[in-house]
Amino acid sequence: MSHNDTIVAQATPPGRGGVGILRISGLKARDVAQEVLGKLPKPRYADYLPFKDVDGSALDQGIALWFPGPNSFTGEDVLELQGHGGPVILDLLLKRILTLPGVRIARPGEFSERAFLNDKLDLAQAEAIADLIDASSEQAARSALNSLQGAFSARVNHLVEALTHLRIYVEAAIDFPDEEIDFLSDGKIEAQLNGVIADLDAVRTEARQGSLLREGMKVVIAGRPNAGKSSLLNALAGREAAIVTDIAGTTRDVLREHIHIDGMPLHIIDTAGLRDANDEVERIGIERAWQEIEQADRVLFMVDGTTTDAVDPADIWPDFIARLPKNLPITVVRNKADITGETLGISEVNGHSLVRLSARTGEGVDVLRNNLKQSMGFETNMEGGFLARRRHLQALAEAANHLEQGKAQLLGAWAGELLAEELRLAQQSLSEITGEFTSDDLLGRIFSSFCIGK
């Protein structure tokens, strides 16, 4: 579809509401105003007017806002009609607007896409609009707003600018070898490169925090039947999300709860008790449990403290540990401390966290909450933080890899040309975040996930 078309869409959620908003953007927005309102409202002033049908009768009445381009969200002429939020009224008004030539329904995210294409937003800011709408916590919303206001983009642009200056110095020295500049050995380039690498590492750390806020962490509770997995799910969720009985195999399917710990979203998954089951339904539940374990960010290995004194996971259940994906983090949870009399708290055993608690009474659960937060490197106080997506983390990682490769070329092979190429590739990876070097296919995938009226 052409970006020269005029587009229209409902900007408020579907259904009944006090106010319903239609947004129009493009060259024909002026014609829509003349036809529907009978006049062109004063720019950026609210005008209370009837919204007219083809025959001149009123369909509704409400507020009209006129934003002539380029001083608008999309950079084009934009008209907003704010009427009553009844679906029938909005549908009649939308059909009236679509009778005008050159006007069509907007695709999902097309308003934000046009803002990006018209340099009103960079790509990271455009993505932040969707993240702000989808934010599941106050901290996620604040970080998304920071991204929308350019906090993330500013950090990326600072890195790109630093790389630009470094490339200029390196490539000038390559192009003018007769000048008395021994750029490979004077230490200046290495110092500047180390500075950029350090700055990039800091941005990556903040981006991982932002990704946690946006994506959350998937935590799977796994263990033998009757270890207290469902009781722990209920304790973490703060409600009776799962049925708890003394009958082994009560949980036969996957149960999911979405919770927050100091603003960090967690996807907690309770699974069927792992054992050799004869029941077909229970076997299916166990298969699903292993599927969830293989996709987890962390496993809470639930142990009934009344059945064993062992604390090393390899001693508790070696077959279970052997089947876990390599490098999957584990927190061993020794449950039923209210019965065993074990001291509540946390310790380290062979590189694994060990938490002693009682899921039934809730004692020690706060220790586990803090362990989950710290295990992901999450910090509660993130003033000025920003949200990040997986593609951002990937681009930052690629840039870091190119800088390390460039440093190796500088110090190991004294290869200035190869260093310059690695710097260029690092710069390109960073520019993909803000959209300076981004394929049309990626843009389509990003904006198609937006709301229709955004």
From Swiss-Prot:
Binds 1 potassium ion per subunit. One of its GO terms (biological process) is tRNA wobble uridine modification. InterPro entries: G_TrmE (IPR031168), GTP-bd (IPR006073), GTP-bd_TrmE_N (IPR018948), GTPase_MnmE (IPR004520), MnmE_dom2 (IPR027368), MnmE_helical (IPR025867), P-loop_NTPase (IPR027417), Small_GTP-bd (IPR005225). (6S)-5-formyl-5,6,7,8-tetrahydrofolate binds at residues 23, 80, 120, 454. Its EC number is 3.6.-.-. One of its GO terms (cellular component) is cytosol. GTP binds at residues 226-231, 245-251, 270-273, 335-338, 358-360. Homodimer. Heterotetramer of two MnmE and two MnmG subunits. NCBIfam families: mnmE_trmE_thdF, PRK05291.1-3, small_GTP. This is tRNA modification GTPase MnmE. It comes from Salmonella paratyphi A (strain AKU_12601). The lineage of its organism: Bacteria, Pseudomonadati, Pseudomonadota, Gammaproteobacteria, Enterobacterales.
